[in-house]
């Protein structure tokens, strides 16, 4: 298996693939998606700055329309979905090249399809459980988004307290947006109430860590003991 770091402007990723041609396809897909977003932002700067949902016209690039739709479902700004959207474009390009396996980690937002079982580590910063467990992901023919937001790890803006909130969806942009939105508001006390808002969404599972508290909702994959290497985490 090939593991290659790839950075383009502020996009910093790790690509996993079986063939170098699939890696190149992923790079091309991500560059095209990011370029589409950048060009659109020149025409609508508010799309980049808003912390609230923003619509996009039908003739906007597909990446922009995905981000806009995700912002409305999760009630966040559209840029909350940019990382997974770019990752999705790269993974989709790998599929189109004929790959049976592809994974892109864009700063903790993972998009994949796979013909094999995978382990995705759970990193939650200072939380006691951090780095000790992994999600056991069964083979996935459909693209899957596993997106994590944190108030204690990384440079992203968060208004919450969670060490990590991970959302699972076959719409990666919406997994990314929901992870951000939930991380902004989740506490151990309101978890069950907040999950009722997720029930009708595109997200089918949520795993949240706040200190020594862990919240689980939905159809989570099996969680197994693991040693998560910090060096394998994609970061700027």
From Swiss-Prot:
It comes from the Archaea. HAMAP family: UPF0280. Belongs to the UPF0280 family. This is UPF0280 protein Mlab_0453. Coiled coil: none annotated. Gene3D superfamilies: ApbE-like domains.
């Amino acid at each position: 298996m090939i593991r290659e770091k790839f950075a383009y402007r502020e996009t910093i990723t790790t690509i996993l693939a079986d063939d170098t041609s699939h890696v190149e396809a992923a790079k091309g897909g991500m560059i095209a998606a990011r370029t589409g977003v950048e060009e659109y932002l020149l025409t609508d700067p508010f799309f980049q700055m808003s912390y609230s949902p923003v619509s996009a016209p039908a003739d906007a690039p597909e990446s922009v329309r995905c981000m806009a739709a995700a912002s409305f479902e999760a009630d966040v700004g559209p840029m909350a979905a940019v990382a997974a959207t770019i990752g999705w474009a790269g993974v989709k390009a790998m599929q189109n090249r004929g790959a049976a396996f592809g994974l892109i980690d864009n700063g903790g937002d993972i998009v994949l399809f796979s013909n094999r079982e995978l382990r995705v580590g759970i990193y939650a910063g200072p939380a006691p459980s951090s780095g000790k467990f992994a999600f056991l992901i069964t083979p996935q023919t459909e693209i899957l988004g596993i997106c994590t937001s944190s108030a204690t790890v990384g440079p992203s803006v968060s208004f919450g307290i969670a060490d990590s909130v991970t959302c699972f969806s076959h719409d990666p942009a919406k997994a990314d947006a929901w992870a951000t939105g939930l991380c902004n508001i989740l506490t151990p006390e309101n978890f069950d109430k907040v999950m009722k808002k997720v029930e009708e969404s595109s997200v089918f599972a949520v795993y949240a860590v706040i200190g020594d508290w862990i919240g689980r909702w939905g159809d989570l994959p099996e969680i197994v003991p693991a040693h998560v290497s910090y060096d394998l985490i994609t970061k700027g």
